[in-house]
Amino acid sequence: MPADVMEKNSSSPVAATPASVSNTPDKPKTASEHRKSSKPIMEKRRRARINESLGQLKTLILDALKKDSSRHSKLEKADILEMTVKHLRNLQRVQMSAALSTDPSVLGKYRAGFSECMNEVTRFLSTCEGVNTDVRTRLLGHLANCMNQINGMNYPTQPQMPSAAAPHPAYGQPMVQLPGAAPQSSPAPIACKMGGPPVEAAKVYGGFQLVPAPDGQFAFLITNPAFPHNGSVIPVYTNSNVGTALPPSVSPSVMPSVTIDSVWRPW
């Protein structure tokens, strides 16, 4: 009997050993394991931020476009983004038009800035190694097309006063208005610059007669509505020492409304 008791007591410490091994603390997680475990939480927060921003953007864009939010309650995310892009493009066009109407030099500055940026991109692509040739060609082609569109934009036309002198687009000469005798016909602007009497050779240019002068300059002759349509013309000069010349067939007494003082001169 004592032998059995001694055998049982000697075996009890061995049986308790596995329990002490199982209670050891786990090893700390590595950085990669921590990222993997926290990734679902970060993804959930990111989606919540996106949905919150899209909700605010939907409210703003519907208010800006003056649309009823109750009729557009189920807009997709792509629809909200497309509406926002279109609205911003329209705002950009309006701002550009307003800037051009107040300061016509804005378009010239924009062209100069775009051209400078295009030159810098071209210089970088020509010196940078590792850029695919196809990518370089497509990028430069896109910039060239944009530059052509910008160059095709026109300056806004400014309203001209009836008696104001404006340069002729082809010759750069002042526009001189000759009042006619008929009240229903509006005066036609002509460009003239001449130092002497007209010679015999005359050509038609833009509906007017172009008469070359002996000194190499030109004069435009315009028909007066007070006379018949069979060939009477009135030359207008910009030189103060040259009077208003009439053809031999026209008498000064038949045109009281056209005098030297009635012609506006810029000097």
From Swiss-Prot:
Residues 34-91 form the bHLH domain. GO terms for biological process: negative regulation of DNA-templated transcription; negative regulation of muscle organ development; negative regulation of neuron differentiation; negative regulation of transcription by RNA polymerase II; Notch signaling pathway; regulation of neurogenesis. A motif (WRPW motif) lies at residues 264-267. The keyword Transcription regulation applies. Transcription repression requires formation of a complex with a corepressor protein of the Groucho/TLE family. Interacts with the bHLH protein hes2, and binds DNA in the form of a heterodimer with the bHLH protein hey1/hrt1. Interacts with the bHLH protein hes6; this interaction may inhibit the transcriptional repressor activity. Residues 110-143 form the Orange domain. InterPro entries: bHLH_dom, HES_HEY, HLH_DNA-bd_sf, Orange_dom. Residues 1-43 are annotated as: Disordered. This is Transcription factor HES-1-A. It comes from the Eukaryota. CDD domains: bHLH-O_HES1_4. Residues 10-22 have a biased composition (Low complexity). GO terms for molecular function: bHLH transcription factor binding; protein heterodimerization activity; RNA polymerase II cis-regulatory region sequence-specific DNA binding; sequence-specific DNA binding. Transcriptional repressor of a subset of early mesodermal genes including myod1 and t/bra. Binds DNA on N-box motifs: 5'-CACNAG-3'. Acts as a negative regulator of myogenesis, mediating Notch signaling to repress expression of myod1. One of its GO terms (cellular component) is nucleus. The keyword tRNA processing does not apply. Starting from late neurula stage, weakly expressed in midline neural cells, where expression is restricted to the superficial layer of the prospective floorplate. Expressed in the posterior somitic mesoderm (PSM) at tailbud stage. During early tailbud stages, broadly expressed within the pronephric mesoderm both around and inside the developing pronephros. During late tailbud to early tadpole stages, expressed more ventrally in the pronephros, and although initially expressed in both the lateral and medial layers, by these later stages expression is predominantly in the lateral layer. Has a particular type of basic domain (presence of a helix-interrupting proline) that binds to the N-box (CACNAG), rather than the canonical E-box (CANNTG). The bHLH, as well as cooperation between the central Orange domain and the C-terminal WRPW motif, is required for transcriptional repressor activity. The lineage of its organism: Eukaryota, Metazoa, Chordata, Craniata, Vertebrata. It holds the Pfam family Hairy_orange. It is found in: Nucleus. Residues 26-35 have a biased composition (Basic and acidic residues). Keywords: Developmental protein, DNA-binding, Notch signaling pathway, Nucleus, Repressor, Transcription, Transcription regulation.
